[in-house]
């Protein structure tokens, strides 16, 4: 893709999200979602392979269905309230339709089937955009309408997402699919706290985006898409091996890394609201994610796979690509836990 075309498409994707973030009118929000969806498809298809075309088609059909449900919910809300404002949704049917549409756009269970397939069919850079930037707009609308959402519906979807995100990633060898299932699980954690403390959801989203960006950048730097290619990292870039190990543990939510902080705060907030069984169940389910990340870390950093190259290290290293954003992102992704007491102001 030529740079001028890429710049135009990327600015349209960003403009669509910004329209959603800054609007309080339902029609403008819907237009923002449509702009974003139509602009992201050429980015997903930039590889020009049958797999990328299939992934883009799946993404388009899912997002178009979600947009249709969203518009239906908006029209029902307009019939009952007589206004286009996002401030409140008095009708439960309209609220349910809007919630389902937004969770479908996020890829939460039971509408999660497209996420692993689409992520696997596209390049690492496109997958990075899909699993980070594309989550911002739907979550911002859920944040704004959180008082009108049915808590039981959202909690049910959150539990299903955490379960499927954990179980789905157990049998995977493709890194993009593992990150896709991890995304589904993280969306579940964000959804469960949304009706109790929406600001905590924003914190969780920020940490999730930082960790996912760092992980994708490391995989892109190393050109790794499978666990087998990742197992040769020690031979090419020894420092990357340690960084990937720590980032995997952080994404799995292992203390004392940054990924543990949002889970800790969410469990604390739920227990303050006299909910004991739900946070206990979610904490146990999070161990599934931690397990497949530990397995990935073991493959990457703690074992040496059979190789035709008998040397322990390359005599000539590849020229390291300079990624300016990577060092601060890795620091935030791994060392944020000591700052957790400062984040208590969010409550």
Curated annotation (Swiss-Prot):
GO annotations of cellular component type: mitochondrial inner membrane
EC numbers = 7.1.1.2
Membrane topology field: Multi-pass membrane protein
**Source organism superkingdom:** Eukaryota
GO BP of this protein: mitochondrial electron transport, NADH to ubiquinone; mitochondrial respiratory chain complex I assembly
Where in or outside the cell it occurs: the entry states:
Mitochondrion inner membrane
An MF annotation (GO) of this entry = NADH dehydrogenase (ubiquinone) activity
User: Which keywords appear in this protein's UniProt record, sorted alphabetically?
Assistant: Electron transport, Membrane, Mitochondrion, Mitochondrion inner membrane, NAD, Respiratory chain, Translocase, Transmembrane, Transmembrane helix, Transport, Ubiquinone
- Annotated membrane-spanning segments are 3-23, 25-45, 60-80, 96-116, 122-142, 153-173, 178-198, 200-220, 237-257, 274-294, 323-343
Q: Which reaction does it catalyse?
A: a ubiquinone + NADH + 5 H(+)(in) = a ubiquinol + NAD(+) + 4 H(+)(out)
The reply to whether Mitochondrion figures as a keyword in the UniProt entry is yes
Known partners and oligomeric status: Core subunit of respiratory chain NADH dehydrogenase (Complex I) which is composed of 45 different subunits. Interacts with TMEM242.
Q: What does this protein do?
A: Core subunit of the mitochondrial membrane respiratory chain NADH dehydrogenase (Complex I) which catalyzes electron transfer from NADH through the respiratory chain, using ubiquinone as an electron acceptor. Essential for the catalytic activity and assembly of complex I.
Entry similarity comment: Belongs to the complex I subunit 2 family.
List the PANTHER family: NADH-UBIQUINONE OXIDOREDUCTASE CHAIN 2
Q: What is this protein called?
A: NADH-ubiquinone oxidoreductase chain 2
